[in-house]
């Protein structure tokens, strides 16, 4: 049901559906066979219907983790909540939020001043999409988007590399001992300049 929704009814977000095999590989890389994990907090800032989070919770153990999510699509968020119900994660239902993560992140620290940080963060964000209507709001938060915010292409607004903002958000949302995994386009790794290169330098220099 979830897969059919993503491939047939997900609208403009459908292309970002994560295949189950990829989600499983990411979860195994993050968690391994560690049986000593308890009270883990897992987060996806572009959760869609929750494929990555479900794989992660299965790898950790549903009874040993709490799920947190946010997604801009109301329809996807409703399907994610169904996914939580079907996978025995009822206690996490209130943590599944519909909204714009980049402009208005919901999950914050207790004092509301900082982003909440998690043990595990996973994401398969939109690689390129028209975010021109919120670009200036995002750019007005340099502390969060320290590597910069991509410009809106003059001719093809939908080719804005918005995924670079999600990478920065993922890094900001990790505990010092946390682990993250994010699906990115292959060109990111070989970037020699721009926002992508700044992010790569931070990952290496700060040993993220």
Spans of model-derived segments:
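Conserved catalytic motifs of ABC-family nucleotide-binding domains
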Residues: 140-158
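Long recognition/docking surfaces used for binding and targeting
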Residues: 1-10
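Conserved Class I SAM-dependent methyltransferase catalytic core
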Residues: 152-208
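A short, mixed-charge helix-start or loop-turn motif at secondary-structure junctions
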Residues: 8-9, 66, 149-153
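Conserved S-adenosyl-L-methionine
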Residues: 12-123, 128-132, 137-139, 184-187, ...
